[in-house]
């Protein structure tokens, strides 16, 4: 795997960020840079304005040296005013993505870049083009992307006349990970370690050469982790060119845009898209950790499907997760209840224990173990309620058991809980519950499961 990463990097020339348009040199003097100084609040930055005279990198430079870091021109520090990015985010709350992109590029010039993942965030590049301003694009090549994603990279470069800056993982770190744990260790002990080596550390190197970056995050992508992302913020996790906490600004122009609207924009503007989208993929990452979503599933359920909803961030946007594992269980109490229907029985822990004890039941029971804050539970709510209506009076009780918080350990030990949602069928004459094995949570699939085993 280390050899694959190394060989792929040699195939791509240049590591300084690409610029859009042949007029970038003439515009360089008009672009201003921003220098960070001491601050008292993370939402504020002190900056000074100075004309930027950037010299392009010589093509004779070693690509290894240039790929290891993104070098931004140095500027002198001068006294300046304080900018409050929390207030700016509020001002831009009703702004269009185009307005937000224009503001970001105007403010940071060539010290800001678009993070491109090879999915629908190609919309960011189109918005940048529409501003008429120079822009830069970078992407993380983990060495394990789908072929369709690499083809999209090529199509985007040709469409916009740019060179995407590809950042690669450290070959030594990848080699150590694979030799010690194998190629697919993330299926057994979680994806965080692999993502840290292949994505987070390369991103950290990239951002150290910038003062701001632009992402394609949307609030509707993951209610569990992204529901509160602002239009613009001081990055809570990564450092920028000037170093230290608060030295990097993060822009999210699509934060308030729904996925359907993004796709309407892409179709209208005839923008190249990843061929995987036509195969049912929505959220696209590395090949082993990405799959198509199914009816009744949330788009992020196509990523790291073997893990809980709260774990479905790779670390690039870790600041979205405001609570750690233990704290997450204390949050759901304030979340609106789901699976509310006269045909769905709400079970207590005692009720579940009784089901476990019975070997001969008068009726079969179908029980969903859920957490109301889980976006994947929310996504199957309509299907489950419809199923309950169809099974009413037909010898199968449909129920729910809230298995987060204090009940989580009990559910893990006694009810086969691995992730939310978990669906169990307690047959009429069987001592053990049968766990629904599929990710298909549409009405027909669930009904077939019940009818075959009831």
UniProtKB/Swiss-Prot annotation:
Active site: 374, 377
Chain segment of the transit peptide: 1-66
Entry keyword annotation includes Transferase: no
Regulation of catalytic or functional activity: Stimulated by sodium sulfate > ammonium sulfate.
Compartments (UniProt record): Plastid, Chloroplast
Disulfide bonds: 374-377
Molecular function via GO: adenylyl-sulfate reductase (glutathione) activity; adenylyl-sulfate reductase activity; phosphoadenylyl-sulfate reductase (thioredoxin) activity
Region feature (Reductase domain): 67-319
The protein's name: 5'-adenylylsulfate reductase 2, chloroplastic
InterPro entries named in the record: PAPS/APS_Rdtase, PAPS_reduct_dom, Rossmann-like_a/b/a_fold, Thioredoxin-indep_APS_Rdtase, Thioredoxin-like_sf, Thioredoxin_domain
Enzyme Commission identifier(s): 1.8.4.9
PTM sites of type N-acetylalanine: 67
Principal place of residence: plastid
Statement: the UniProt record of this protein carries the keyword Kinase: no
Domains (record comment): The C-terminal domain may function as glutaredoxin and mediates the interaction of the enzyme with glutathione (GSH). Active in GSH-dependent reduction of hydroxyethyldisulfide, cystine, dehydroascorbate, insulin disulfides and ribonucleotide reductase.
Induction pattern: Induced by sulfate starvation. Induced by cadmium.
Described function: Reduces sulfate for Cys biosynthesis. Substrate preference is adenosine-5'-phosphosulfate (APS) >> 3'-phosphoadenosine-5'-phosphosulfate (PAPS). Uses glutathione or DTT as source of protons.
Region annotation Disordered: where it falls in the sequence: 1-21
PROSITE patterns recorded: THIOREDOXIN_2
Organism annotation: Arabidopsis thaliana
The entry's keywords: Acetylation, Amino-acid biosynthesis, Chloroplast, Cysteine biosynthesis, Disulfide bond, Oxidoreductase, Plastid, Redox-active center, Stress response, Transit peptide
Family: Belongs to the APS reductase family.
Gene Ontology CC terms: chloroplast; chloroplast stroma
Domain of life (superkingdom): Eukaryota
HAMAP family for the chain: CysH
Tissues and organs where the protein is expressed, per its UniProt entry: Leaves and stem.
CDD domains for the chain: PAPS_reductase (cd23945), PDI_a_APS_reductase (cd02993)
